[in-house]
């Protein structure tokens, strides 16, 4: 019997039976209930009935293919030769055989834990990059699994392609920075929450996975977790009448609170141990980003790369980066809004609860994160990855509805527009990625040439590398690669405890008084024309 005949008679094909079994395993109730729900949802939705059978034929193969394509793109387009820069050097040195670099108030411990299996064994940057790329693909796949259920698998995979196709996701996934992982944790957590709310019941495994996703996100970026899952808590309380779902809401809220307690609790404990308490740590975090000043446009200006600041004196682009790409970003935003309506129609159609609120949950959480990162004076493109990951779900919902709801020529036109949207993303975002990676490679070569110059000058452990108040941008990474300690703006030699001292200053600047008569060496030509003052007689 052909697939279409089985489909028309309501019988599940083997990939769908596997999907139904997986749903039943992660939620309460027998497998037959999951299969019946999948079948009834398909019959009830005319758009789903109209979907092409071959799109359903792959089943879980769609998310697997999307994650594999993302991982392959990382290996093809991200260079393994890019060295560790400032932030990466700090994270890589924490759980390793290396001298730990100074820990800042703005950082969280999740990322050093993630890469500990590599950093404990080797200092190879190539090994670290390969590990991060593979883990990034696995993380994207696991996050997509959380959204399987009433959405066809190809729609979930499409969301993964939309997010994974962004230049910032491809670049950051290969770097030792936390925002990509915060996006993965937030995406998985919101998906698990919505799936339980949509089904009206939870399971022990589902609650445990939700708590794990919240904990993971909070360990990566506590602020992201508080915003995303704080909003999810509010939605959990208001989306269903308490008289009908008290146990469900209690279980989900308990998982979220437990996850936040573990992840944010670690941050609070560390605040008391090393930073004088949470309030002082928050103040130090604000200072690290240049302060706080609300600006809702700055992040939009750098969606396609660059740096921007709300205050004079900090590096900032003029105007908008890559203005022609604004048309695609605008289409992305419009699709995300349409996706709220689409999800209400074919995912959250049950009138027993506030389907509009659940359909809008990804957009609400995305807007919350965007508002959070509209406050720092120095904004960075990478901070918004949780925003794009959540909006990708709504955009994929919109595309599904647009290509299945209409008939005849309208459907053909909708499919063509959807293909153009995805193709335009992959093409234009790759161009931005290539330009950004070229800049990082150039900076990386300059940094490593300067490190080699210092090595030839006899800089060896035990040593300390410091800078004047005008810090050279590669001071800390140089300390990492040379096996030295790093001290910001050392004021006297007693801080070195007898170790060799190297002072790096920008060209034309003067070092601290204790180093003014040391031999000055102009290092490899890089931004700022740095000069190194190396202590002799050691």
Where are these regions (language model features)?
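Perimembrane helix-loop-helix junctions
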Residues: 43, 195-199, 203-207, 227-261, ...
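Transmembrane alpha-helix segments characteristic
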Residues: 66-70, 159, 163, 214, ...
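Signature aromatic-anchored transmembrane alpha helix within multi-pass, membrane-resident enzymes
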Residues: 67, 257, 261, 399-432
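Short acidic/glycine- and proline-prone juxtamembrane loop motifs at membrane-interface regions
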Residues: 132, 168, 174-182
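Hydrophobic/aromatic-rich transmembrane helices and adjacent perimembrane loops
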Residues: 172-173, 179, 220, 226, ...
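Membrane-embedded, lumen/periplasm-facing catalytic core of multi-pass transferases
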Residues: 193, 414-477, 481, 485-486, ...
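Membrane-lumen/periplasm interface segments of specific transmembrane helices
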Residues: 250-331
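Hydrophobic, aromatic-rich transmembrane alpha-helices
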Residues: 312-356
């Amino acid at each position: 019997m052909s697939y279409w005949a089985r489909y028309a008679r309501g019988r599940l094909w083997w990939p769908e039976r596997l999907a139904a079994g997986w749903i039943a395993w992660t939620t309460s109730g027998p497998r037959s209930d999951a299969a019946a729900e999948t079948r009834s949802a398909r019959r009830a939705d005319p758009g789903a009935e109209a979907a092409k059978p071959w799109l359903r034929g792959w089943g879980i193969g769609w998310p697997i293919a999307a994650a594999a394509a993302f991982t392959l793109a990382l290996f093809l387009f991200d260079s393994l030769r890019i060295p560790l820069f400032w932030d990466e050097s700090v994270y890589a040195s924490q759980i390793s055989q290396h001298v730990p670099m100074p820990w800042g108030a703005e950082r969280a411990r999740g990322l050093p834990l993630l890469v500990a299996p590599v950093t404990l064994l080797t200092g190879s940057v190539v090994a670290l990059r390969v590990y991060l790329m593979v883990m990034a693909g696995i993380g994207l796949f696991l996050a997509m699994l959380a959204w399987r259920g009433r959405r066809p698998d190809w729609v979930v995979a499409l969301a993964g392609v939309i997010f994974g196709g962004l230049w910032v996701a491809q670049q950051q996934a290969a770097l030792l920075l936390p925002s990509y992982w915060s996006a993965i944790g937030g995406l998985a957590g919101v998906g698990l929450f919505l799936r339980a709310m949509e089904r009206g019941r939870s399971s022990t495994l589902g609650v445990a996975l939700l708590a794990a996703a919240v904990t993971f996100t909070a360990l990566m970026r506590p602020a992201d977790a508080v915003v995303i899952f704080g909003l999810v808590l509010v939605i959990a309380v208001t989306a269903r009448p308490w008289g009908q779902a008290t146990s469900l809401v209690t279980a989900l809220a308990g998982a979220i609170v437990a996850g936040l307690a573990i992840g944010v609790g670690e941050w609070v404990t560390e605040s008391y141990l090393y930073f004088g308490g949470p309030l002082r740590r928050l103040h130090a975090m604000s200072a690290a980003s240049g302060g706080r000043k609300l600006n809702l446009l700055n992040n939009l200006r750098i969606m396609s790369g660059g740096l921007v600041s709300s205050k004079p004196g900090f590096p900032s682009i003029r105007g908008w980066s890559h203005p022609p790409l604004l048309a695609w970003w605008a289409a992305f935003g419009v699709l995300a809004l349409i996706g709220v309506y689409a999800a209400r129609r074919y995912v959250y159609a049950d009138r027993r609860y506030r389907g509009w609120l659940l359909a809008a949950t990804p957009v609400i959480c995305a807007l919350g994160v965007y508002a959070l990162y509209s406050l720092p004076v120095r904004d960075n493109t990478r901070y918004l990855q949780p925003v794009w990951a959540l909006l990708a779900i709504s955009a994929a919902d919109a595309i599904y509805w647009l290509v299945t709801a209409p008939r005849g020529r309208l459907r053909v036109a909708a499919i063509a527009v959807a293909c153009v949207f995805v193709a335009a993303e992959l093409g234009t975002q790759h161009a931005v990625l290539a330009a950004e990676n070229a800049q990082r490679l150039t900076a990386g070569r300059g940094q490593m040439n300067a490190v080699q110059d210092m090595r030839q000058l006899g800089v060896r452990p035990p040593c300390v590398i410091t800078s004047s108040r005008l810090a050279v941008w590669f001071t800390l990474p140089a300390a990492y690669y040379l096996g030295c300690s790093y001290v910001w703006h050392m004021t006297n030699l007693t801080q070195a405890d007898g170790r060799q001292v190297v002072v790096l200053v920008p060209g034309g600047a003067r070092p601290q008084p204790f180093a003014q008569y040391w031999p000055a060496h102009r290092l490899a030509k890089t931004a700022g024309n740095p000069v190194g003052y190396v202590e002799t007689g050691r």
